[in-house]
Amino acid sequence: MSNKDIRVVVGMSGGVDSSVTAHVLKEQGYDVIGIFMKNWDDTDENGVCTATEDYNDVIEVCNQIGIPYYAVNFEKEYWDKVFTYFLDEYKKGRTPNPDVMCNKEIKFKAFLDHAMNLGADYVATGHYARIHRHEDGHVEMLRGVDNNKDQTYFLNQLSQQQLSKVMFPIGDIEKSEVRRIAEEQGLVTAKKKDSTGICFIGEKNFKTFLSQYLPAQPGDMITLDGKKMGKHSGLMYYTIGQRHGLGIGGDGDPWFVVGKNLKDNVLYVEQGFHHDALYSDYLIASDYSFVNPEDNDLDQGFECTAKFRYRQKDTKVFVKRENDHALRVTFAEPVRAITPGQAVVFYQGDVCLGGAIIDDVFKNEGQLNYVV
């Protein structure tokens, strides 16, 4: 089958990465369709609907490239599957990663299903990751070539079934090259800055945004031995290892968040970047997903490396099944500020094996006060 007989539906955000993704596929001769996903009804601080601006960029890019385009509304799916989860996690005192859930439930589920209904053979996105397809049909996901932009961390929950229908055309080139291609082609998004902030919601003031949905309950900020250091403005606004925004003055080392007590509405703080309370030996994680589950013997356990947050260096770990629903991940050496609600993502070299969501953190067999 030649490329012109293969239909690829590209998820287009109005950014440079998805624009170049569509261009590359078109150049390779595929039957390309661009789809803009509208997942949040939003305006920026100036009252401008950012989704409309982004969609206008998608229209212009698709016209430049010469491909058809559509907009699809996934607001209900996003609210039900991602945003509700996001709020529930904050209510539990955890720090969720909505991008992980957004990829699992929206970009590579709702969008993937929609694309298949359009007769797509594959979907493509502008993620910095790579797919390796074996002769027997199974696939592996590899880190993007641009180490600084690799996004496999956020894709860790994707299954073999999902990834077998996915293309990441820019995963094997550097970000600077993506910009160069966009400029060379005169794409309107060539100089558009990268989006940051919450998946699909953008760069809002996080505290203001969250307070619209969850009532804040101020409370005491104390040390682990009970010394009162001030007031916090609501546990949901703080994460483990956080330094800024505590408002604790005085001499000596900076202060850091080392735990939360939801029952008493207390935020625990201690002084010093390397305070002992910030370090742990192992974690328990649930909602685990592996790209090739049969390759990993969870009963015997296996060694690999892991990341506990985006753009963190890999750490050597040992992964073993804890029970029917959870994994125990033991670190080769203590790790600082592991955060319940975040993803732990597993690697063998460049291959992303999968990941899980961190529940509890332990030191010397005792659970830490990270979230109690």
Curated annotation (Swiss-Prot):
Localization, UniProt: Cytoplasm
HAMAP family: tRNA_thiouridyl_MnmA
InterPro entries to which the protein is assigned, alphabetical: MnmA-like (IPR004506), MnmA-like_C (IPR046885), MnmA-like_central (IPR046884), MnmA-like_central_sf (IPR023382), Rossmann-like_a/b/a_fold (IPR014729)
UniProt xrefs under CDD domains: MnmA_TRMU-like
Keyword tRNA-binding: yes
One Pfam family cited in the UniProt record for this chain: tRNA_Me_trans_C
UniProt KW keywords: ATP-binding, Cytoplasm, Disulfide bond, Nucleotide-binding, RNA-binding, Transferase, tRNA processing, tRNA-binding
Any one GO molecular-function label of the UniProt entry: tRNA-uridine 2-sulfurtransferase activity
Family: Belongs to the MnmA/TRMU family.
Protein name: tRNA-specific 2-thiouridylase MnmA
Gene coding for it: mnmA
Chain's role: Catalyzes the 2-thiolation of uridine at the wobble position (U34) of tRNA, leading to the formation of s(2)U34.
Domain of life: Bacteria
Protein residues bound to ATP: 11-18, 37, 126
NCBIfam families linked to this entry: PRK00143.1 (NF001138), trmU (TIGR00420)
Residue ranges, annotated region (Interaction with tRNA): 149-151, 309-310
Ranges for region Interaction with target base in tRNA: 97-99
Catalytically driven reaction(s): S-sulfanyl-L-cysteinyl-[protein] + uridine(34) in tRNA + AH2 + ATP = 2-thiouridine(34) in tRNA + L-cysteinyl-[protein] + A + AMP + diphosphate + H(+)
Example of a GO cellular component annotation carried by this entry: cytoplasm
Disulfide feature: 102-199
